Regions:
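CN hydrolase (nitrilase-like) catalytic-core segments centered on the catalytic cysteine
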Residues: 1-8, 77-169
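Short beta-strand scaffold segments in enzyme catalytic cores
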Residues: 23-27, 59-60, 125, 144-147, ...
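A short, polar/charged loop-to-alpha-helix boundary motif
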Residues: 39-52, 169-183
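Non-catalytic surface loops within mature trypsin-like serine protease
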Residues: 29, 149, 178-180
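Flexible mid-to-C-terminal extensions adjoining Fe-S/redox cofactors in radical SAM and related proteins
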Residues: 185-193
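Active-site catalytic loop in hydrolytic enzyme cores
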Residues: 14-88, 101-114, 190
């Protein structure tokens, strides 16, 4: 609260009240409220190594900047989840992710870009970098965080507003104009919504 910012945290294994373990992302708003979004679709390796259970609810989180949606890693690969968030008014999707190799990263990246195009929204991907030797299923990481846009006039060339170097701790900043999304949805080259 003292810094007057909203924080979209990454996700991590969290023990639920009934004893299950879920992968949960937390959102801390500047008004002091805390929101949680469960990962709906755990990966096979999450199920195998950590016995992660999938959540069953996804919805927008109301912020003072408008509604946002959280798609944790693999959830970005399921178009129906993103469409539900877009139908609820989300114009920005946040995708915290943890991939161990370039192939896994590219799946999340390509699907996140598709979600930006399909739903005419912004997608902010933020991934883990560094290695954790001795921690099962977390020993290596591959990430290249980015801020993605629809592919149309008024937006960044190639649908990429900002992109980090691979496997480097860094901060990315981009100005995202939500009125450009309104324009795209009403006047754009394609109108998906």
């Amino acid at each position: 609260i003292s810094y007057n910012i909203n924080i979209i945290g990454g996700s991590h294994p969290t023990r639920t009240d009934d004893g299950d373990i879920q992968n949960v992302a937390y959102v801390f708003l500047r008004d002091g409220s805390v929101h949680a979004q469960e990962k709906i679709h755990p990966t096979p390796s999450e199920r195998h190594w950590w016995n992660i259970k999938g959540g069953d609810q996804i919805g927008t989180i109301q912020t003072d900047c408008g509604p946002v949606g959280i798609l944790i890693c693999y959830d970005s690969e399921f178009p129906e989840l993103a469409r539900k968030l877009a139908d609820e008014g989300a114009k920005i999707f946040f995708v915290p992710f943890c991939t161990d190799n370039r192939q896994g990263y590219m799946r999340v990246r390509y699907c996140s870009q598709a979600r930006a195009i399909e739903n005419q929204c912004y997608v902010v991907m933020s991934g883990n970098v560094g290695n954790l030797p001795g921690v099962e299923n977390m020993d290596i990481q591959y990430a290249k965080s980015c801020i993605l846009t629809p592919c149309d006039f008024n937006f960044a060339r190639d649908g990429i507003a900002e992109e980090c170097s691979e496997n480097v701790e860094t901060v990315s900043i981009a100005d995202l104009d939500l009125t450009d999304l309104d324009w795209a949805r009403q006047e754009g080259t394609v109108r998906n919504l």
